[in-house]
Amino acid sequence: MDIRTITSSDYEMVTSVLNEWWGGRQLKEKLPRLFFEHFQDTSFITSEHNSMTGFLIGFQSQSDPETAYIHFSGVHPDFRKMQIGKQLYDVFIETVKQRGCTRVKCVTSPVNKVSIAYHTKLGFDIEKGTKTVNGISVFANYDGPGQDRVLFVKNI
């Protein structure tokens, strides 16, 4: 398994698989090209035999340099349960730690039970939100009206 930083030219390759990897959910608009142009040093792709198996898009906060943020990550459905996601998170965390970050944050939708379980398994804590949905603390309207989100934080 190879891990490398992303490049601008990876945009089409990554965005072309989003809907397929997420079971038909329309997610391409959640990952604009700007991430591939401005956050290359903290975003990564895994591959095997020149085929992409996973990716992680993240960055160090400019507003709070001790905080890093994972914007989007994914693993090819045929390669799940092989620790690829964990490897991507580990490389990202080590990279931002070297830049002085002491915590990593990320968000997910309250309906994404797999993501919630995955992040808690990786040691992320759910931040106390503004309401509770199905026993999970969420921030109401975090990404706009009706777009509640679960916020995670992990001290590193």
Curated annotation (Swiss-Prot):
Protein name, UniProt field: Uncharacterized protein YqjY
InterPro entries: AcTrfase_GNAT_prd, Acyl_CoA_acyltransferase, GNAT_dom
CDD domains the record matches: NAT_SF
Example GO molecular function: acyltransferase activity, transferring groups other than amino-acyl groups
Pfam families (alphabetical): Acetyltransf_1 (PF00583)
Start and end residues of each N-acetyltransferase domain: 1-156
UniProt subunit comment: Homotetramer.
